A protein has these predicted regions:
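Flexible active-site lid/hinge loop adjacent to a nucleotide/diphosphate
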Residues: 136-148
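C-terminal accessory "lid"/substrate-recognition subdomains
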Residues: 2, 151-154, 160-210
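Tryptophan-centered motif/residue detector
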Residues: 36, 113, 142, 209-210
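A short alpha->loop->secondary-structure connector
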Residues: 111-117, 142-143, 169-176
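A broadly conserved amphipathic alpha-helix scaffold signal in soluble, globular proteins
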Residues: 102, 106-109, 150, 170-173
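Nucleotide-state-sensitive switch-loop elements of NTP-binding domains
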Residues: 2-12, 17, 21-135
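Non-catalytic interfacial helical region
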Residues: 108, 130-138, 160-162, 167-169
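Conserved beta-strand/loop subsegment of P-loop NTPase cores
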Residues: 37-38, 91-92, 117-126, 146-157, ...
Length: 210
């Protein structure tokens, strides 16, 4: 009988887009029968109180220095191994705004975790005003975060004009391969059903241009 793999979800995005709030919104909807663990940066956008999460029965591991892209390797491996001892159903990872999401995914797919983990839906939270700004769109880090995600989340939509949102959707529709889902949210509130949206592994790669 094949070993059941633990699902892993990555939430990436630039600083200030609402990644931590998005993670908290998912936690608030968690099935009480599911066991989650969380891997976060030492310094989140608005902070995740490890003590509070422990009270809720959700183990939390923090990467020292606050940057998963720098910690991919021994620190990240050690944190993952510790979390897996809890035999979780899901691992939720909030990446630093400076993290290359593809590097984090590569670490998850490498030994010794390849046989233990299933890379499930990957989220990237963006501010549509940045997404349509060429100064952001041409940054390698930004393209990496956009390219690796399955679900592109437009946050802070209440601060955008209708024209900006229309341009966001126009550009998002032209991404190749297309995203499994492109959504608008307010206050970074995600739908927990998106965690189990079907994803295609080969659709994740680093875009050359938006």
């Amino acid at each position: 009988m094949p070993i059941k793999k633990t699902k892993v979800h990555l939430i990436s995005g630039f600083l200030g887009t609402g990644k931590t709030t998005a993670l908290k919104s998912l936690m608030a909807q968690k099935d009480p029968n599911e066991k989650w663990v969380i891997l976060v940066n030492e310094f989140g956008e608005i902070g995740i109180d490890g003590a509070v999460l422990s009270d809720e029965g959700i183990p939390v591991a923090e990467i020292a220095g606050g940057c998963l892209c720098c910690a991919a390797g021994p620190q990240m491996g050690s944190a993952l191994a510790k979390l897996l001892r809890n035999e979780p159903d899901r691992i939720m990872i909030e990446a630093s705004g400076l993290a290359h999401a593809a590097s984090v995914i590569d670490e998850l797919k490498a030994a010794p975790f390849a046989d233990q983990l299933e890379i499930a839906a990957v989220f990237t939270v963006v501010d549509p005003r940045q997404f349509i700004n060429p100064d952001y769109a041409q940054q390698a880090l930004y393209k990496d975060q956009i390219g690796i995600c399955d679900i592109l989340v437009a946050s802070k939509t209440d601060l955008c004009t209708p024209e900006q949102l229309a341009e966001f959707h126009d550009k998002a529709a032209k991404l190749f391969p297309p995203k499994a889902k492109v959504v608008e949210v307010q206050n970074a509130q995600l739908d927990i059903q998106w965690l189990d949206i079907p994803v295609i592994e080969k659709s994740r790669y680093r875009l050359k241009a938006l």
